[in-house]
Amino acid sequence: MKKLFAGLLVLSSFVSVGQRVHFQSGTYVLTTQKESIATADADEKEAQNMYRVVAFDRVLTDAEKGAWQKAGWELVGYLPDRAYLLRGIPGRVKAAAEPQAVAWSRLSAEMKLTQLLSNGNVPDYVEVRDRWEVLFLLADTRSALRFEQQLSGSSVAQVVRIETDEPQVVRVQVIPQALRALAAHPAVQFVQQKEAPAEPENNVGRKNHRTNAIQNEYTGGRAYDGTGVVVGHGDDGDIGPHVDFTGRILANYSNASQGNHGDHVAGTILGGGNKDPRGRGNAPGADLVYYSYPGNLTQVDNHYGLHAVRVTNSSYSDGCNAGYTMNTRTMDQDIRQNKKLMHVFSAGNNGTANCNYGAGAGWGNITGGHKQGKNIIAVANLDGNDAIAASSSRGPAHDGRIKPEVAALGTNVFSTIENHSYASFTGTSMACPGTAGTLATLYHAYRSTHIGQDPDGGLVKAIVMNTADDLGNAGPDFLYGYGRVNALRAARAIEQNRFMIDSLGAGQTDTLNLTVPANTKELRVLVYWTDPEALANAGRALVNNLNFRLVRDGQFWLPWVLNPNKNVASLNAAAVRAVDSLNNVEQVTLADPLAGPYKILVNGFNVPQGPQKYYVVYEFVPDYVELTYPMGGEAVVPGSNESIRWDASAGTTPFTLEWSSNGGASWSFAGTAPAAARSANWSVPTTPTGDLRLRIVRGTQSDETNAPLKNIAVPAALTVAWMCPDSTKLSWNTVPGASAYTVYRLGARDMDSLTTVVAPTLTVVMPAVQNTWFAVAAVTNNGRAGGRCIAIEKGTTLSGCIVEKDASVQSITAPIAGQFPSCQP
């Protein structure tokens, strides 16, 4: 251990009882200190960084915060109750004269730990042999680089290098006894255990977003895979080569490759899963127009017509809380002028940053610029359990508007990288393409149910927000927006035409009728309009201000409104019913609404650029439970663990999972889940069968897979046994319970079924010079193919063939007729 860490286990000493401050690891009492708050110890001087936990007798006003900032301190964030985390550089800070601190402490090692790390009760996945894998959040990128350098050669800690969008985070495998010594480093702000292991597949995102639920694998199910929908994706230079992009790149306007970011994002949007089925994207039927960023934005006016681009994906930042810039104005203008278009952006990875919104670190740090627009979608980053990632940027927008709009899986997303490989990346860069792909499937759904017509981009955005699964505080909030995207609910809203479109001018009021059916558990009504672009120097972005209320029998309900005041308490508070004068979206929800007629009143309160077109979308959430993965027809592996997903109305009764292998004649217990859960792990039965079913039960409610699952192992060790000039032999290991094997070969876009054989070998007649890919799946006892193995590429080099030279017969002069032996025994 280098000198910098010596002696850092000693915590600051307290001299009297003082104020309580709450951290993840526990509650700490701060007291008055004898020494000056600006006094740096030797370690802080060497690190050129010092953190202070400072308590006051009240929440500071902006002016009072400014006094501490003038004294050289950065207010990193608020700590309950009435305390702040301050950061300074030794020798450049002093104590502010007013307001004076009631008490203070150095940020101790224990204060920096999660509760699990503090208690030493870490999950198994954190343990790597005799070490724990943890993530250190440093003060800035420079501090992170120095921290890595100081760990070089350490016997108790080793840096784990992975590709990440978070340069301030250092991943380390550390001996548990040394954890607190490292945490006490003056530049370390926070330490957490490594993330829970993700399923090694983009299928996690498909299940989270419910795109799997509208791309069913059973006869008669939905098949909205984005076919024919064009996505404009701008990123870090050329992508590929990758077999998952086969037949999917409509046009490529990129420069030379600069890395794997673009490959990964493209695969998340529409990868075919040709090599590894687990890497299938959200819209595998869609087409891609690819650019070096920001070509997908600068060229959209031309390519909206030339290539029929309908959705764009941009996982790039454009400043932090940059305000309503010229870029923002252009994005809003794009959507207004190209009515069938929608821009999708990552919200950003600055969740802990202070981007000068005015509430300190952790708020108002959307990384744009362009993603501050009113008419676009900015996406937050969730993990596989629907928890917001610490790095995910928060709202509000610069003027207090709701940001982000929605959230999606962005943590440990498995997708394509160059040279036919895959990797797991984390960031809103990954949540954004999951949402863009989901939108492509919804455009497909609209075309399929509306005689081939495209929906307005604003309508799709409204449907996505109103059908999202509410997370965080009830109603919209500045972390999750309107919640996690739910493609199944959105597709049903499209199929059932649960929307109305109208327009009005200044001072006009429209009255729209709505009948709520019986047994509705929740009613959601959302009004949205594509607002004209504002002047770039305008103090408030909203131009046309519509107001909306829901009315029944003289009683009325106003939309949910957030408080954008620049303090932590306001920004953390749940939405309240009020008049909204900031946003171009307003939503009313009612729990357990009475059945019968309601009226939707939309008023053009201030419409300087009218008339204004608007969309009303509505959702009747029944009292129900519904499996969303698996839905039927999926392949599972005996003895494996599957992450099961379902949707359900709110309730207090827990869920029970059951499985059957006899057509539902009897059911076996598979596990339970709490009432608030919407996912659970299932240990798949070990006996192979083509007739496995799953159901979920809550009280008298239940739902089961719409068709049997295919429970059989994936063939292993697929290889090219030999390759001759005119044929290639494939072989693989046998699979227990398999009645046959289906062999797949790469087609124009996807892996197509070639033939089915009984033995674990196949000789394919084809020229050796023809490059292609093969895969194989085991067939169950009732003739249903299970999951494909990872595909292998057949090259063009002869191997294992008795023929020593690559020669061909041009003509036969003698004998005129007869039989010729094969070149293989």
Set out the residue ranges of the language-model regions:
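Autoinhibitory N-terminal propeptides
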Residues: 18-224, 228-230
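Beta-strand-rich modules
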Residues: 764-784
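C-terminal subdomain of the subtilisin-like protease fold in secreted/lumenal serine endopeptidases
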Residues: 279, 290, 444-520, 538, ...
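Substrate-binding/access-modulating region of protease and related hydrolase catalytic domains
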Residues: 143-148, 177, 226-227, 272-277, ...
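Catalytic-core environment of secreted peptidases
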Residues: 234-248, 381-433
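Pro/Thr/Ser/Gly-rich low-complexity, intrinsically disordered linker/stalk tracts
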Residues: 710-736, 782-801
